[in-house]
Amino acid sequence: MAQITKAHHTGISVRSLRESTKFYKELLGFEEVFTWNPQAEYIGVLTGYKDVNLNATILKMPGVDVFLELLEYGNVDLKDIDHGNANPGIAHISFFGDDVDEWYRELTEKGVKSVSAPVTPTIGPNKGGRAIYMIDPDGVRVELIQSSKSFGEYKGE
């Protein structure tokens, strides 16, 4: 059977490429790799939107090979979706940070909304750390975690 060999990127559909790029670059520290307008027949076939006008920005998390692809779809009827954590689909994306409380202060001062104030997990791999769900310009939950362990290091309670 074929196997997945590693993660490539996470794609997020956005209403405004400019606004979302600013959020991830200026507020979360991602670096812009490139912006492009990929126009080819296979794009329409792959996405299921024959006449799509796609604009994309590729962002990189500093110091690691973690990439976000922000996608703005043109020539397509856009529909808002409810990004609530319990709804089917992508619930959130998550990143480690060195000071969740400072992130919260800085981001809320700049008008970024959150689901709650930072919390201290009492169970699981992030026990004793700090966590927060911030909300990006399109309603996507962005979890910031301050913890000494990753999922791969967790051995259970």
Predicted region positions:
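N-terminal beta-strand motif that seeds the catalytic metal site of vicinal oxygen chelate
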Residues: M1-T21, W36, Y42-Y49, I90-F95, ...
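Core segments of cupin and vicinal oxygen chelate
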Residues: S13-D65, P125-K127, Y133
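Vicinal oxygen chelate
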Residues: V14-R18, V64-D65, E72-D138
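Short, flexible helix/strand-to-coil boundary loops that buttress conserved ligand/catalytic motifs
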Residues: Y24, L107-T108, K155
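Short glycine-/small-residue motifs
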Residues: F67, R141-L144
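Residue-level recognition of conserved beta-strand positions in structured domain cores
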Residues: L70-E72, Q146
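Aromatic/pi-system hotspot detector in well-structured domains
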Residues: K79-D80, E143-I145
